[in-house]
Amino acid sequence: MDKILTAADAALRTLFAQPSAAERSPAAGIAEGELTEAQRRLSGALMRVNHVGEVCAQALYNAQAMVTRDMVLREHLLEAAREETDHLAWTRDRLNALGDRPSLLNPLWFAGAFAIGVVAAKISDAASLGFVVETEEQVSAHLESHLGLLPEEDRASLAVVARMKDDEERHAAAAREAGALQLPPPARALMRLAAKVMTTTAHRI
């Protein structure tokens, strides 16, 4: 019951509360750039996509933590979720600064990622960690692409994305060291397809 309550609390905080970061945002102290309206809309759309990614990360980690019976792994997953909360707050702050909003479909994205996390964790802890590795690697690659898409004048968003990319790579490495199982190619391809649908939709909605 405690695990279920923890997961429910995480869902409510992720979807409906203003997230609070434990660590100072990489954008702190960086002056807002002079953006054209088109650049502002582009930055807002890209940061909305990144915010959705962090919503999904919260769902994935908390679902896996709810299911696993390995208390060491559970604490590892919850710690990763706490670190991802910083990303959630940073991306939300950038959306606010850019005059944009989170995706209206965040509850749907959260539910889908939570379901994937539960299924993966029920297969095995190694499979669960394999999903973490694949997710973090895909997110890292996505963030890398955003570094080339964001307007160079938006130095605050660029700083946030660069730091997030470093953190995601560290999370993937930690999951591999914890015994992650490499996912079969069909599973990785399906995850890439789902990510494509999510990012394309979140860019607009």
Curated annotation (Swiss-Prot):
It is an enzyme of class 1 (oxidoreductase). Signal peptide: none annotated. Fe cation 2 binds at E84, E136, E168, H171. Its EC number is 1.14.99.60. Binds 2 iron ions per subunit. Its cofactor is Fe cation. InterPro entries: COQ7_proteobact (IPR047809), Ferritin-like (IPR012347), Ferritin-like_SF (IPR009078), Ubq_synth_Coq7 (IPR011566). Belongs to the COQ7 family. This is 3-demethoxyubiquinol 3-hydroxylase. It comes from Delftia acidovorans (strain DSM 14801 / SPH-1).
